[in-house]
């Protein structure tokens, strides 16, 4: 297997915390920066602080613009780029709302904590009244539930919604978010092309129960902490790399030395770590395999296990990530080392195809030609074949 490049850090780079733009639950804050002369500098600061850059506006992303931009101030959806500079200068995460553009008249110094004495302008009053839900809000709610609700009781409890309110994905209170989901959005994921909700087996029963007594199911305890999903293909960590050859080394068998590294990505699907060589069979060859054929599982040598451990530790050190996050990245890239490294660095695979998601893993199990052809069109025949082999092992 090709050796991983030397992992060094630029001594002249930014010095602020590498987790400055990471939330308390471990998820990275997403930022969209409007084109400007300061975009490159801001991008460097955001990425060094553990944040994620989005190429397009998306639900949940913090929209950044420079003060004075008419369109940004008119919309009221943008945060001043000064927020990033102040966070870096103080090396702490500041309050976003103090930097929102265009909603209220602000003092000349927008920094939090600035004295308001002597100002003739009255203190801005809190927003009152009911805030209407937009399609973007609904998508943000459904996406958050899909990625964070780990059990049917999560959506009827309060912990999930309080956490969502704290994440500032929308401007609504947690009570309003919960009511919106239970009464209007639950079971409607297909209308937003989001696939099935993770709690769909009991959704109708829970909906009836929640409408009768929404507070009854609140356990008061947060759900088990889960490593957040890595950003989708339109969110990139830096500039996109040029396409290269996909590495044919896969990680597939478990290594006890690294401890438990199971990622709950799809039913009966655990990621195991080792390496195997050779190209996988094509989907056609795979479909011709007889069900009664038994293949002897290849044994893993101590040297291969040691190499796998070394590589994963290097990935963890290089990208400053924990074992669970690196393991999840390997899982989403079918264990391909080069693709995983490229994805962690730039947010994209070198072959240009997207990473695998839970819904497509479920579709891969269906015995349906149309579904399989759609997956081949989306991921490429070779990647589909590799995914099938990866799931088998």
Curated annotation (Swiss-Prot):
Ranges for region Disordered: 104-132, 194-248, 272-305
Alphabetized GO MF terms: telomeric DNA binding
Biased composition (Basic and acidic residues): 223-248
The BRCT domain, residue ranges: 10-101
Biological process annotations from GO: negative regulation of DNA recombination at telomere; positive regulation of canonical NF-kappaB signal transduction; positive regulation of NF-kappaB transcription factor activity; protection from non-homologous end joining at telomere; regulation of DNA-templated transcription; regulation of double-strand break repair via homologous recombination; telomere maintenance via telomere lengthening
The keyword Protein transport is annotated on this UniProt entry: no
Motif Nuclear localization signal in this chain: 377-393
Keyword Ubl conjugation: yes
A Pfam family reported for this protein in Swiss-Prot or TrEMBL: Rap1_C
Modified residues (N-acetylalanine): 2
Sequence position, cross-link Glycyl lysine isopeptide (Lys-Gly) (interchain with G-Cter in SUMO2): 111, 191, 205, 209, 237, 366
Principal cellular location given in the protein's record: nucleus
Compositional bias per record (Acidic residues), positions renumbered to this chain: 282-297
Keywords assigned by UniProt, alphabetized: Acetylation, Activator, Chromosome, Cytoplasm, Isopeptide bond, Nucleus, Phosphoprotein, Telomere, Transcription, Transcription regulation, Ubl conjugation
Phosphoserine PTM positions: 36, 43, 151, 153, 200, 203
Myb-like domain mapped to chain residues: 125-185
Localisation per UniProt entry: Nucleus; Cytoplasm; Chromosome; Chromosome, Telomere
GO cellular component terms attached to this protein's record: chromosome, telomeric region; cytoplasm; male germ cell nucleus; nucleus; shelterin complex
Subunit structure: Associates with the I-kappa-B-kinase (IKK) core complex, composed of CHUK, IKBKB and IKBKG. Homodimer. Component of the shelterin complex (telosome) composed of TERF1, TERF2, TINF2, TERF2IP ACD and POT1. Interacts with TERF2 (but not TERF1) with its C-terminus. Interacts with SLX4/BTBD12. Interacts with TERF2; the interaction is direct.
Function, in words: Acts both as a regulator of telomere function and as a transcription regulator. Involved in the regulation of telomere length and protection as a component of the shelterin complex (telosome). In contrast to other components of the shelterin complex, it is dispensible for telomere capping and does not participate in the protection of telomeres against non-homologous end-joining (NHEJ)-mediated repair. Instead, it is required to negatively regulate telomere recombination and is essential for repressing homology-directed repair (HDR), which can affect telomere length.
Recorded family membership: Belongs to the RAP1 family.
Entry protein name: Telomeric repeat-binding factor 2-interacting protein 1
Source lineage: Eukaryota, Metazoa, Chordata, Craniata, Vertebrata
């Amino acid at each position: 297997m090709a050796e991983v490049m030397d992992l060094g850090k630029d001594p002249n780079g930014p010095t602020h915390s590498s987790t400055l733009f990471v939330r308390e639950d471990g998820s990275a804050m997403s930022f969209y920066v409007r084109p400007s002369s300061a975009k490159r500098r801001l991008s460097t600061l955001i990425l060094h602080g553990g944040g994620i850059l989005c190429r397009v506006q998306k639900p949940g992303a913090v929209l950044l613009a420079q003060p004075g931009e008419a369109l940004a101030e008119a919309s009221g959806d943008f945060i001043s780029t000064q927020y990033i500079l102040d966070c870096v200068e103080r090396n702490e995460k500041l309050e976003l709302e103090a930097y929102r553009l265009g909603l209220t008249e602000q003092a000349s110094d927008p920094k939090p904590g600035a004295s308001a004495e002597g100002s003739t302008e009255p203190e801005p009053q809190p927003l009152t009244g009911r805030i209407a839900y937009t399609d973007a809000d609904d998508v943000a709610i459904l996406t958050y539930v899909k990625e964070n609700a780990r059990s049917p009781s999560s959506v009827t409890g309060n912990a999930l919604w309080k956490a969502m309110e704290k994440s500032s994905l929308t401007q609504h209170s947690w009570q309003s978010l919960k009511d919106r989901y239970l009464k209007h959005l639950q079971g409607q994921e297909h209308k937003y092309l989001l696939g099935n909700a993770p709690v769909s087996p009991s959704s109708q029963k829970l909906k009836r129960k929640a409408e009768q007594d929404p507070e009854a199911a609140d356990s008061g305890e947060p759900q088990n902490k889960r490593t957040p999903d890595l950003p989708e293909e339109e969110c990139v960590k830096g500039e996109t790399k040029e396409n290269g050859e996909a590495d044919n080394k896969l990680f597939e068998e478990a290594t006890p030395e690294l401890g438990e590294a199971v990622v709950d990505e799809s039913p009966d699907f655990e990621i195991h770590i080792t390496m195997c060589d050779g190209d996988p069979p094509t989907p056609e060859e795979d479909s011709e395999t007889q069900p009664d054929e038994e293949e002897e599982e290849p044994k893993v040598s101590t040297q291969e296990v040691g190499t796998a451990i070394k590589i994963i530790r290097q990935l963890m050190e290089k990208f400053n990530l924990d074992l669970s996050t690196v393991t999840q990245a390997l899982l989403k890239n079918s264990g391909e080392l080069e693709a995983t490294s490229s994805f962690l660095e730039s947010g994209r695979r070198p072959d240009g195809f997207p990473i695998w998601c839970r819904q497509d893993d479920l579709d891969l199990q269906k015995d349906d030609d149309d579904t399989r052809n759609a997956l081949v069109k989306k991921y490429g025949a070779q990647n589909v074949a590799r995914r099938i082999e990866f799931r088998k092992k």
